[in-house]
A protein has these predicted regions:
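C-terminal and inter-domain tail/linker signature
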Residues: 1-143
């Protein structure tokens, strides 16, 4: 039997897919350390994460969703691999919408304190793969 942390992580992803960022982060501490390693950005508060990070994904892809999550309970850390998929119908940094669909594998860790509150996270993904799928850089010719 795993800890309740997996259920919190799963509920957070379900809330993301519903665009309910407040529900997604209701188990987050006010002060967190959440790092998007691909972008080199760290968020220090729940409010910053909710207001600045999460909406950026939806701005880039209004139909973005988390597909096929697999959760690994490691006690006070839950590791999840999943795919974010959607249509690039909004700006991505300096790049305008391409209208292309994408499917990007991610690995995410949520870190919990002893009371089950989320105190941080780490997100890993390949930005080059995303840009290639969107036609914003050449795809590798290697097989």
């Amino acid at each position: 039997m795993g800890s309740g942390n997996v259920q919190v992580h799963r509920a957070g992803h379900e809330a993301f897919n519903q665009r309910d960022f407040e529900a997604m982060t209701k188990q987050y501490a006010d002060t967190i350390t959440w790092t998007d390693h691909a972008q080199g950005r760290t968020f220090r508060t729940r409010q910053e994460f909710t207001d600045d990070f999460l909406p950026g994904w939806v701005q880039t892809s209004s139909d973005i969703r988390i597909d096929g999550p697999r959760y690994l309970d490691a006690g006070q850390t839950v590791v999840c691999t999943f795919t974010v998929a959607g249509t690039h119908d909004g700006p991505l940094g300096p790049f305008p919408a391409t209208g292309k669909e994408f499917a990007l594998p991610l690995c995410e860790m949520w870190h919990f304190d002893s009371s089950g509150q989320v105190i941080g996270g780490d997100l890993y993904y390949d930005q080059v793969s995303l840009l290639a799928q969107l036609g914003l850089m050449p795809q590798s010719s290697n097989a």
